UniProtKB/Swiss-Prot annotation:
Binds 2 [4Fe-4S] clusters. One cluster is coordinated with 3 cysteines and an exchangeable S-adenosyl-L-methionine. This is Ribosomal protein uS12 methylthiotransferase RimO. Catalyzes the methylthiolation of an aspartic acid residue of ribosomal protein uS12. InterPro entries: Elp3/MiaA/NifB-like_rSAM, Methylthiotransferase, Methylthiotransferase_CS, Methylthiotransferase_N, Methylthiotransferase_N_sf, NA-bd_OB-fold, Ribosomal_uS12_MeSTrfase_RimO, rSAM. It comes from the Bacteria. One of its GO terms (molecular function) is metal ion binding. It catalyses: L-aspartate(89)-[ribosomal protein uS12]-hydrogen + (sulfur carrier)-SH + AH2 + 2 S-adenosyl-L-methionine = 3-methylsulfanyl-L-aspartate(89)-[ribosomal protein uS12]-hydrogen + (sulfur carrier)-H + 5'-deoxyadenosine + L-methionine + A + S-adenosyl-L-homocysteine + 2 H(+). [4Fe-4S] cluster 2 binds at C147, C151, C154. The gene is rimO. Its cofactor is [4Fe-4S] cluster. [4Fe-4S] cluster 1 binds at C15, C51, C80. The keyword Transport does not apply. GO terms for biological process: tRNA modification. Belongs to the methylthiotransferase family. RimO subfamily.
Length: 441
């Protein structure tokens, strides 16, 4: 180990898209000879990649910056909260530099200034797939930046700009390198996966001798040829999403859709500037399940949005009862500085938000428990995430890492992370499954 090599620490907060930004920064720095330090003490400089979407996220970011300052003292701040440099420097005036999201060159330049690189031309420093912060067997694949929507509760377009898609060939090249490096599952992410390629007018780029359109359907079809799991996140419910379902039924991509519906009351959806045809959405969900019976549907919702009445909330509960989504997250509405929703009338009291959140989660818990119980006695493919002396923990095709449920295989210690195995489901609760290897004597 070259003792003269500079070491960089990183703290990555927020969503998987921010994690990919952190990976890109580290890949660039590693290529220049920097080592990645797992501790504050060992690092010559620390990068804090912040989240600035909610006030609670900003508070967490400021706390993380403060910890890095206390433990190391040489801190570069980037990410979504980096757009509010005044707030950061007011709380932590000693930070070395502050940059906004996706400003990789400025982050790298700040690192160069704080800890000039020591080059070693004889070392192959970076693996072909780049530096990743996830386990070896799965990786996030970011296909675009920014968003063209004007949802009133959100400031992502202000933080990350308008939609900017990557050419299909570049996405597929990265995906292929990840697969060759041993990644067994790709999680496709963006702010709006369905809108991929709109800014490029769905232009074609060459891939293995054939043109591939920068469009979600064609991209998914090409990713499906890699022979690994491909999971779609942040899918806005455009009509052409229906084209993806046959690919799931054919086994090209995982039968999993993460669609942020946000609410079911037409009045609230209109106030949010979201699609408001939830009756048609129920019909689409029924069609999807007819074409691909194994499809798992995940979504997120907001309760307590300004103007939400008890009747609006009941419409949401009734819709949930009909939709029977498999995996659901729910957030109590929180005002975001700069969001248009802040100007809306009829704010919902905090105690009402809390009460509705508990009612929502209780209702969804019953749905989840019922749907998971239907899997008992069936054999399901699972990917293994962890193995210890007690057994293995994995996930089904219907479960994404970190946000969905787990599958526990007690006593199965011979497996390894990344293994994909058939599992006989023996027990289920509201969120998780238990089972054993199928066909085992």
């Amino acid at each position: 180990m070259n003792k003269d090599l500079q070491k960089v620490g990183i703290v990555s907060l927020g969503c998987p898209k921010a994690l990919v930004d952190s990976e890109r920064i580290l890949t660039r720095l590693r290529a220049e000879g920097y080592e990645v330090s797992p501790t504050y003490d060992d690092a010559n400089v620390v990068i804090v990649n912040t989240c600035g979407f909610l006030d609670s996220a900003k508070a967490e970011s400021l706390e993380a910056i403060g910890e890095a300052m206390a433990q190391n003292g040489r801190v570069i701040v980037t990410g979504c909260m980096g757009g509010d440099e005044a707030a950061i420097r007011s709380a932590h005036p000693g930070v070395l530099a502050v940059t906004g999201p996706q400003q990789y060159e400025r982050v790298v330049a700040a690192v160069h200034e704080a800890a000039p690189p020591a080059h070693d031309p004889y070392l192959d420093l970076v693996p072909a797939e780049g530096i990743r912060l996830t386990p070896r067997h799965y990786a996030y694949l970011k296909i675009s930046e920014g968003c063209n929507h004007g949802c009133t509760f959100c400031i992502i377009p202000d933080l990350r700009g308008k939609l900017v898609s990557r050419p299909a060939s570049k996405v597929l090249m990265e995906a292929e390198k990840l697969a060759e490096a041993g990644v067994r599952e790709l999680l496709v992410i963006s702010q709006d996966t369905s809108a991929y390629g709109v800014d490029l007018r769905h232009g074609e780029s060459p891939w293995h001798g054939a043109p591939v359109k920068a469009r979600m359907t064609e991209l998914c079809s090409a990713l499906g040829e890699l022979g690994i799991w491909v999971r779609l996140h942040y899918v806005y419910p455009y009509p052409f999403v229906d084209e993806i379902i046959p690919l799931m039924a054919e086994g090209k991509i995982l039968p999993y859709l993460d669609i942020p519906f946000q609410h079911a009351s037409p009045k609230i959806l209109e106030a949010m500037k979201r699609p408001a045809a939830q009756d048609r959405t129920l019909e689409r969900i029924r069609r999807w399940r007819t074409i691909c019976p194994d499809i798992a549907l995940r979504s997120t919702f907001i309760v307590g949005f300004p103007g939400e009445t008890e009747d609006d909330f009941q419409q949401l509960l009734d819709w949930m009862g009909e939709a029977e989504l498999d995996r659901v997250g729910c957030f109590k509405y929180e005002a975001v500085a700069g969001a248009k929703a802040n100007a809306l009338a009829d704010a919902v009291p905090e105690e009402v938000k809390e009460e509705r959140w508990h009612r929502f989660m209780a209702a969804q818990q019953e749905i989840s428990e019922r749907r998971l119980a239907q899997k008992v006695g069936t054999v399901i493919e699972a990917i293994i995430d962890e193995v210890d002396e007690e057994g293995a923990i994995g996930r089904t095709k219907g479960d994404a890492p970190e946000i969905d449920g787990s599958l526990f295989l007690n006593g199965e210690t011979s497996l390894a992370p990344g293994d994909i195995v058939p599992v006989l489901i023996e027990h289920a609760d509201e969120y998780d499954l238990w089972g054993s290897l199928a066909g085992k004597d």
